[in-house]
């Protein structure tokens, strides 16, 4: 029989259950938390994650429009596949194959991102230290088949103390595992060990075998994607200093100097690279440090076109050009067809640029001597056949190669054609006969080049074109920009000009400065038409015109004398040579009538040039130098001096005529300004009177109150106000009690408030910078990060050029003003727990502090209850100590690490990082002392006085220590009185008790220890073998190298201590004293026996079997007693339990008796009556 099932019927109303649930309102209990514990754990985890994301707010100074490329360092032991990994990543990002990888390699990895790959030499500790300071991302390669090696752990510890960049682990050689289970176990072990060193959850990639010289494409794709989206946080040291990784360098030394002076002369070197960190000052003379070379001053710095721009930057340039074309077409009334650029979704192949000047990119290799082009092998098919050129490039090359005449033959008989319709000139006769001595006709610059004609030629007048707009001085190209042919063509064409002879304002002054002192003065006449027109304008210009001194002093193409001359309105002809040599500083001050004060110039300036002193004695000169009031009025205006100078002006009515009344040249009406200043002074006086009259508010001005004579209560109130102000400031800075004072604050947390402040300040700075011209911004801000620059250094050692190796990085770091100075640095230091030996004071130690690597002699110290700084001979175990060393100053809280050996030949199998620490104080006058014990012996003893010898060698030394505290070994304290006359070095001392001849007298003293001023920079890049730098060696190492024995001091040798046994005589009491003693205290002594007594003769001495038997019986009795005591204890415990049980039974029995009595009296009490005795007495109960 077939089974029949009931058909399912769907519910007609789906929300019926929900309607029934909410008929009586919302039921809160129905929606309670199902698992409160799980919810609490989830909230705790969310809070922990949010707290781990918080960091100290820091200013990110990286420019957003064109950031510098991120430095990706590939680090690992030898043979782990560093070169293969770089080759694979470059192939993935640029589709270019590199055969010889040397130096930095910059590639475009995204629309806004570039990467600079750098391979770290595996065997050079110096390169590891330098790369750890500049790397943004570290690809740490690990041999998965072998495990972690010493170089890996050393680099991680170095990076931890230099900012700790982002670290990605890459495990290689995993194809050598045959078993999958072993591979999984090895991966797990490597991952957890890597997490221990970096952080929990650090990413570790796995790369299998190599295919065709590269890693598998899928694995490299995953790694490159992870690198491209990684975010980097600014590090403190890099956020405060400019630095650069040089990608190439050039020797600019003139070959003639090398030939004449020899190969050992210092060189002029230019290095190229991208700037990172903060902006680098554009002024020459900026101090920088090249790691491995030394400190240098920047001789010249120039910004170059970016050799590897990002697509975003290129798109901005294209948009700028397109907008410019639109504006020009709109001005001409044309319709433009220029369209906007579409949004990029992916990189085109043409945008995947690569820049590696020291590697063989595209068959071109740039070396320090030449540029090498790979032309292929001989057995390959030739890519070029003469006569069968395939393009313009090949035609150009064949044209250059087919030389029929030499250079001398080509230029033989060739003349100079100045104009297109002119004839060639072979000779030029000197018709003008220029006088060498005249300053107008022959003016030469420092390099010996003539500046050309100074007078205006009459036939033609060339100047500024009419159709062009007025140019500003900031629109001129700088001296550092390269010269192009387009400018050549434009400047060579004659153009009509418009000359305004009536313009005498500031704008006209700017034009004159543009036309007379531009960079075209040093060029030839055909490029200097603006200068010639300006010379004519300069003669017709009014001398009374006021120049803008604020713009004149920033013109770098004129001298200070020219700046003063223009500001004073003088002409070249009216100024003789004596006026040029006058002191420039006195010319900055003018009287109201427009004349320059000549008091100081007339009397003293000429004498100073002749080196003739105008003071009779040195005392007069010192008095004049210390007199501040004599020159105070020269630098401060009347409104600034205030009330203090009113009495002086009243007492001396001629003071205005004596010192002159100065005017502000940038202000149009100085008299109105003086009136405004006087009004402001009166207002300030009224405010000060009101403030002083109010006693409650007077304590807020702490600086003014400290100068007054305050009572004790007023001082307490002022100190309390100071403390309250400091407490409030501390709470604001630390974020405590946030939102209590200001409840309407729009920020939820203090962290968001600080980030908003930083972003607001950055926005204000950017607005100010955008209002400036590019030249002004570069002068004030410097070359910002992301700029590709060329920096020239002079006096570089020739070994740097001779022994250059592109495999070792060249790192240039900028120095702050504090870091240029040298002094004593106090730091907190600890020996690394993996280093084998403890460190000894004054042993040389190579420190990596800031950009520098240098060798110094540290002294390890500790503090004794904050009273003295005591020297330690060795570093303590597992704890920090203080260290003082001489070296370059660095800001406090700067971490550093130290190593003892950097040469590979002296390195063993141990861990090389010897110490780590942090700077606490700089340039301190630290007083370090060490303990010194002087030992003496008494040779004459009186009651409380003794004569001591063998402690000092002369009476002078004793006089130095008069009054010093001394002490004996037995603890008797004393004091040094004075020296004795006859035995030299002996002295008299007083003690608190009589001492013995056997006592040793000790003087505890503290001897000052000075830090040795030893600074030896690690110049590893100057060596041919970069890994073999050896600094100051230890004495033991020198003796071992020279095969010398260690000299032995007999006093320092250890001997067996043989102490003489002391015999003490018995106490003898006189008989007269014994007779006076009471009977109880008398001394009872037996007289010595002449013969043996009975007890001595009959003494029982056990031996043999009897002794064994007695000892056996004793043991048996001991065991029996132990058993009896144990049995007694057991019986006592049983008796105790039985008594407890009996007490419980007795209690139960008494409880039953009570209940029976209660029940009996309750029943029989009803039968009694109030009357008769018979009825009141109870009846006898039957038995």
UniProtKB/Swiss-Prot annotation:
Residues 68-233 form the Bms1-type G domain. Residues 1-23, 451-461 have a biased composition (Basic residues). It is found in: Cytoplasm; Nucleus, Nucleolus. SUPFAM superfamilies: P-loop containing nucleoside triphosphate hydrolases. The modification Phosphoserine is found at residues 438, 478, 492, 518, 523, 574, 578. GO terms for biological process: endonucleolytic cleavage in 5'-ETS of tricistronic rRNA transcript (SSU-rRNA, 5.8S rRNA, LSU-rRNA); endonucleolytic cleavage of tricistronic rRNA transcript (SSU-rRNA, 5.8S rRNA, LSU-rRNA); endonucleolytic cleavage to generate mature 5'-end of SSU-rRNA from (SSU-rRNA, 5.8S rRNA, LSU-rRNA); maturation of SSU-rRNA; maturation of SSU-rRNA from tricistronic rRNA transcript (SSU-rRNA, 5.8S rRNA, LSU-rRNA); regulation of rRNA processing; ribosomal small subunit biogenesis. Gene3D superfamilies: P-loop containing nucleotide triphosphate hydrolases (3.40.50.300). Keywords: ATP-binding, Cytoplasm, GTP-binding, Hydrolase, Nucleotide-binding, Nucleus, Phosphoprotein, Ribosome biogenesis. The modification Phosphothreonine is found at residues 504, 516. Residues 76-83 are annotated as: G1. GO terms for cellular component: 90S preribosome; cytoplasm; mitochondrion; nucleolus; nucleoplasm; nucleus; small-subunit processome. Residues 435-447, 468-491, 653-697 have a biased composition (Acidic residues). Transmembrane segments: none annotated. It is an enzyme of class 3 (hydrolase). The keyword ATP-binding applies. GO terms for molecular function: ATP binding; ATP hydrolysis activity; GTP binding; GTPase activity; mRNA binding; U3 snoRNA binding. Changing residue 82 to A: Strongly decreases binding to GTP. Residues 207-216 are annotated as: G5. Residues 1123-1136, 1143-1160, 1174-1183 have a biased composition (Basic and acidic residues). Interacts directly with RCL1 and the U3 snoRNA to form a stable subcomplex. Component of the 90S small subunit processome also known as 90S pre-ribosome that consists of the 35S pre-rRNA, early-associating ribosomal proteins most of which are part of the small ribosomal subunit, the U3 snoRNA and associated proteins. This is Ribosome biogenesis protein BMS1.
